[in-house]
Design a protein with these regions (language model features):
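Conserved Helicase C-terminal RecA-like lobe
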Residues: 1-93, 98-104, 170-177
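A structure-centric signal for secondary-structure junctions around beta-strands
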Residues: 39, 89, 109, 137-139
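Structured loop/turn residues at secondary-structure junctions
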Residues: 47, 98, 118-119, 147
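Short amphipathic alpha-helical segments
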Residues: 55-57, 104-108, 125-126, 156-157
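Short, acidic/turn-prone active-site loops that include or flank metal/cofactor-
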Residues: 70-74, 116-121
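Short, well-ordered beta-strand core segments
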Residues: 93, 112-113, 131
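A short beta-strand element within the Helicase C-terminal
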Residues: 104-117, 140-144
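A conserved SF2-helicase RecA2
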Residues: 119-177
Length: 177
């Protein structure tokens, strides 16, 4: 998995990253090891459709019941994926942060994983809040798959700095503001 900065910014001023996916992937291997042991339905997010598709292929090959929710998912099937996940018919909901990170409820899960994070902490917080909603009965565990010294690590540190600055400006010390 290789991330390259395109030197361009999206409409929110966040760097646009180009992802080259490679197999084998240590990150995907670590995720699959973790996924074998995790209990209950799991929500998985990434910025990359390619990463979601790779994970979906691996999970499908392992016999897991999966739903994929990206910008490429037809509108007519999006709600059925959410409904199936909420009804316990799927083990994994895999989605991109942009497509699935806002406006949907995934409270049947109390476990969430991120392959990578958006540059903007608000997008990440919105994605996290898909499980932190009215109707959630359990504490939610959030797992990030990243390695030190990588772009993922840089994104993580940038988001931590952005939250710290925001808290300083607002005078708010609550987690996630």
């Amino acid at each position: 998995l290789m991330f390259h900065d395109t030197g361009k910014l999206d409409r929110l001023g966040e760097p646009i990253m180009k992802v080259k996916l490679r197999e084998p992937s240590a990150k995907l291997d670590a995720f699959m090891d973790w996924a074998e042991d995790v209990k209950g339905p799991v929500v998985v997010f990434s910025q990359s459709v390619g990463m979601i598709n790779l994970a979906a292929a691996r999970l499908d090959a392992s016999g897991a019941r999966i739903g994929v929710y990206t910008g490429q998912t037809p509108d007519r099937v999006r709600q059925s994926i959410i409904d199936d996940f909420q009804a316990g018919k799927l083990d994994f909901f895999l989605g991109t942060i942009k497509a699935g990170g806002e406006g949907i409820t995934l409270t049947t899960s109390s476990t969430m994983a991120f392959f990578d994070r958006a540059w903007g902490p608000f997008r990440n917080k919105q994605a996290e809040d898909r499980t932190h909603r009215a109707g959630q009965k359990n504490a939610v565990q959030i797992v990030d798959f990243f390695a030190p010294g990588t772009v993922d690590s840089r994104v993580r540190n940038t988001n931590i700095d952005k939250w710290a600055t925001l808290k300083l400006i607002l005078g708010d010390d609550r987690e996630g503001v």
